[in-house]
UniProtKB/Swiss-Prot annotation:
It comes from the Bacteria. Pfam families: Ribosomal_L17 (PF01196). It comes from Natranaerobius thermophilus (strain ATCC BAA-1301 / DSM 18059 / JW/NM-WN-LF). Part of the 50S ribosomal subunit. Contacts protein L32. This is Large ribosomal subunit protein bL17. GO terms for molecular function: structural constituent of ribosome. GO terms for biological process: translation. Belongs to the bacterial ribosomal protein bL17 family. The lineage of its organism: Bacteria, Bacillati, Bacillota, Clostridia, Natranaerobiales. Keywords: Ribonucleoprotein, Ribosomal protein. One of its GO terms (cellular component) is cytosolic large ribosomal subunit. The gene is rplQ. InterPro entries: Ribosomal_bL17 (IPR000456), Ribosomal_bL17_CS (IPR047859), Ribosomal_bL17_sf (IPR036373).
Amino acid sequence: MSYKKLKRNKDQRKALLKNLTTAFLRDEKIETTEAKAKEVSRLAEKMITLAKKNTLASRRQALSYLTDEDVVTKLFENIGPKFQERQGGYTRVLKKGPRQGDGAPMAILELVE
């Protein structure tokens, strides 16, 4: 499986992506760097696809990845049914421009309505 390193080792990268994905699904919109937004988008799409299946096994699989049980409940009760007819493309990455402090390219990641 290919992925971006995000200048972190495996454990740090995994923790960062878990936390960002959980925050994104909780708030339905986050602002982060472009590289992180693209990686979180991939993971969020997989979580929403699991939520569309709505089985006990898929719920447990989402619980093993996401860090908050309330987010899993929201994912399976609100977000999953909303995208039931849609075949992928649940998220959108909007480029925002460079960050003030270090010039890192920023992006807004949001759910498609």
